């Protein structure tokens, strides 16, 4: 089956053609080999077209400070609970470059896979890179992986939320959209079979389409094995647009919207009832191929923020199901209303609260509205009196009597002391005169 669609390209190396820079769109032809896929489906990296402003050239310089998305978290308190050690997180993306020093020891290349075909549907040779998925000519997957599990390094305050988790690199897509629903489904199954506890998918369908059976079955395969599947909600939210995207909309998948520095939905972030939570997705610092960092925007970088939290929970509570981990993240999210809304889901993820506000023996199965923001109590208003009440008058007069009495007593006491002192002085004068005669 031959499918023609529109691909919203993600950020590349900072050099895109004039048309691409203006529109962020490129026409692509996708060959889908699955007989089970009955509808057109194209996949896209979930990064706004306007996000690529030239900052994401690579290799790059180090970002010296602590990014705002990490400043909002007490990392010492968070990592006292869990660092993600022992948990594998699959990054299904454009590959993960292990030459960046913060990712070299974070990536398990032996478990990686490259699912891009040798040639595209036009018969043109694709620059696939190695078979382990550890080459990334786009830079997208490398940034995603860094947000999850980048190791601490001198000269930068950037680090992954789960700095001891292990990344499984799966190269399944590229800047031209050569990934398909079939290869995405294969990637999910590969991740599960290689022992992933969490899967991050920062891509979605470019157009609203019906679910694909092969993709749905792959997601179900992961969930049945307690694997948490996190997916970006998409970046078609400008103007309040609501568009259902996959795999984010599948039952059991934690769909992540993007929030800004004010814990509000980022303007581009996709809205919908399928949104589970939101996470920082504006001015997101992360690793790039080779070395260094860059800043980017998009739900592509909100999803790995949540995947990192999921890895922390998975390491601390390995017996929990995927549903319980997702529910815990949703239940403990920061929100301004008691329930769910289609902009930020159950709220903006709170990593520390997700790890500390928990009953290990009774994990949350589904988020509850009453567990969100408590409603404020009505203020207690004092009675309004025009003029002085009888009680107030009695209190005032009583005060006057007491104060007046104290003044009189003090005056009398003072007079007595004065008389006494005067008598003593006269006595001393008289006594002094007799002695001298």
Q: Model regions: which residues?
A:
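Secretory targeting and sorting signals
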Residues: 1-52, 401-421
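Catalytic-core environment of secreted peptidases
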Residues: 116-126, 258-300
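Cytoplasmic C-terminal tails of single-pass
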Residues: 424-437
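Substrate-binding/access-modulating region of protease and related hydrolase catalytic domains
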Residues: 172-246, 292-297
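Hydrolase catalytic cores
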Residues: 147-148, 281-349
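Active-site core segment of subtilase-fold serine proteases
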Residues: 53-164, 193
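C-terminal subdomain of the subtilisin-like protease fold in secreted/lumenal serine endopeptidases
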Residues: 318-412, 432-435
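Short helix-loop-beta-strand segments that form the rim/entrance of peptidase-like active sites
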Residues: 93, 157-175, 199, 321-333
